[in-house]
Amino acid sequence: MSEQFKDNFWGPNGFETIEKRMNQGTESTRLFLLFLKERAAIEENYSKSLQKLLKSTSQLIEYGTLRDAWYGVRGEAESLVRVHHELGQKIEKDIVAPFSKFKSEQKKVKKNFLYDAYKLNKERKDMESSITKTRAKYDDYSKQAETIAITMETAKNTKTAAEVGKIQSKLQKIQRDASSAEQDYRDSVNKLSMYQPTWEDKVSSNYHTLQLTEEERIDYIKVQLEKYVGAIKSTVPDTETTNRNLVNVITQIDKLEDIHCFVRESRTGTEKPPPPQFISFGGKSSSDYIQNKASYSAPLTSSVSSNSLTSSYNSATTTPTPAPRSTPINLSKKKQAKALYDYVGSDATELDFFAGDIITILDEDESGWFRGELGDRIGLYPSNYCEPI
């Protein structure tokens, strides 16, 4: 299994995990540099302190063997002054100065790469957020259309034509809003679907670049630690065993092993996010309620006379429940009906007409929904909106 950044951080918080490691690396570099700077300062200060001590005791006068011993003590201290001064200077000039420059330069480079990764991460999150919002809007309008369609179905049994017309107008508006919201939702899904391959390539490239900067950091610190051991070895006597152990552990620093260790312990997922899918409204579509108008119950049964129909609407009384639907009756002789009220169909299967229009009756149904012809249009219409002529 690959243990590269670009193959293991596709899961949730993948970018955040890499970002955290990059920031940890920056902080570690700062602390490595701080240690070396302080070690150099301590060595220099120790050298100066010894020098000051030697100066303050320079008036000590002895004779014979005690004088010889004193000279030996001073000589050892003077040797340490030189050793610690040289070690401090080597660490400061050969390690700290270039290390400080590397730290500043890599911090800027990583900041730019991390910002690129942040933008890519935010870009996708913004697109996903747009999909979530447009889907919620689409579902909301679709649900409203579904509810109003049910209301209109019931209203055709209980309400006046004018009241039904208002409900119908509201339904048509909500359906238009739902259609617009659906298109926005589809556009959001398509936008991310089309961009996804490009986005994946950019993310892979960016993560690989971030890994290279981490490898560079590990390699550079390894070199500086080797120089540090070399400085100690060349200036401090009697440290051969310590130096040998330190050299061995520093030599074993392996950038790839360290990268793989981080990946194994922190990976968020190897599967790239699937492309988004358009999900249709989960409820029953409003079109399910208006697709087959012959199955609707008309406000009044076809057996009610035109006078009763007119009286019923004028008094706004509750209408009786229609009889169950029966098999349509084919007319041997075409009949006509005159529209008593304006009617706007809820879709293309219904006839629109105005009061006074003459409709040729093609089929009658006991449910109250007739099929008729008006001009060059044929469709379903509620028979209780008309009177036979």
From Swiss-Prot:
Protein name (record): SH3 and F-BAR domain-containing protein DDB_G0274695
GO CC annotation: cytoplasm; perinuclear region of cytoplasm; vesicle
Region listing for Disordered, in residue ranges: 300-329
SUPFAM superfamilies reported for this sequence: BAR/IMD domain-like (SSF103657), SH3-domain (SSF50044)
Record keyword Secreted present: no
Occurrences of domain F-BAR (ranges): 3-258
Residue ranges annotated for the SH3 domain, each copy included: 332-389
Xref: PROSITE patterns: F_BAR, SH3
PANTHER family: PROLINE-SERINE-THREONINE PHOSPHATASE INTERACTING PROTEIN 1, SH3 AND F-BAR DOMAIN-CONTAINING PROTEIN DDB_G0274695
